Amino acid sequence: MEVSREIIEKLEIFQKLVKKWNKSINLVSGNTIHNFWQRHILDSLQLMQYIDNKEIHLVDIGSGAGFPGIVLSIAGVAKVSLIEADLRKCIFLEKASKISNNNIQIINQRIEKVAIDCSILTCRAFSKLNTIFNCIKNISVQEKVLLLKGKNYLTEIVAAKEMWLFDYLIHQSITCEEGKILEVSNLTKII
């Protein structure tokens, strides 16, 4: 995955900020700090290969430490809205948003209460598919939902298919053998 020197420098600044704030508000698991670049930065950055047009509005739910939302903004996504219920994490996200040259909006609310339109929605390390789909029912996603998932992704798909109609593609993560990227479109709740 090729990125410019400027983007790498900004991602390194972001990495330092996450590590600094992690001491006080536990943004990422302590056992991932030693492998930070692959575990967090590249894991988020790999989503860029599924974003055809950078001039979009992307919504990242449960943004926490800014993965993948801040990383995708630094990589060139024009407008990113980060939805996070924890005020302390929103304060961190506000600081981190200054690293990007692009438009970042921080929304300090529970996801279920946010009504917003976007081209693409992302989330990472948030919840099971059914929970995610229920949380985003007020968010109008025009194009697709990109989800970074772990080894239980197939079980989650089967369970979600009982309550939702959707199309999906499964992509292999470049950072983890068990990791998958689910690309979901045409999401509709079964009545």
UniProtKB/Swiss-Prot annotation:
Residues binding S-adenosyl-L-methionine are G62, F67, I111, E112, R124
Q: What Enzyme Commission number(s) does the record list for this chain?
A: 2.1.1.170
Q: Where in the cell is it found?
A: Cytoplasm
Q: Which InterPro entries match?
A: rRNA_ssu_MeTfrase_G, SAM-dependent_MTases_sf
Return the SUPFAM superfamilies for the record: S-adenosyl-L-methionine-dependent methyltransferases (SSF53335)
Q: Which Pfam families match?
A: GidB
Q: Which Gene3D superfamilies match?
A: Vaccinia Virus protein VP39 (3.40.50.150)
Q: Mind telling me which GO cellular component terms the entry cites? A: cytosol
Q: What is this enzyme's catalytic activity, as reactions?
A: guanosine(527) in 16S rRNA + S-adenosyl-L-methionine = N(7)-methylguanosine(527) in 16S rRNA + S-adenosyl-L-homocysteine
Q: Give GO terms: molecular function aspect only.
A: rRNA (guanine-N7-)-methyltransferase activity
Q: Report keywords, A-Z.
A: Cytoplasm, Methyltransferase, rRNA processing, S-adenosyl-L-methionine, Transferase
Primary enzyme class:
transferase
Q: What does this protein do?
A: Specifically methylates the N7 position of guanine in position 527 of 16S rRNA.
What NCBIfam families is this protein classified in?
A: rsmG_gidB
The family line of this record is: Belongs to the methyltransferase superfamily. RNA methyltransferase RsmG family.
The name of this protein is Ribosomal RNA small subunit methyltransferase G
The encoding gene is rsmG
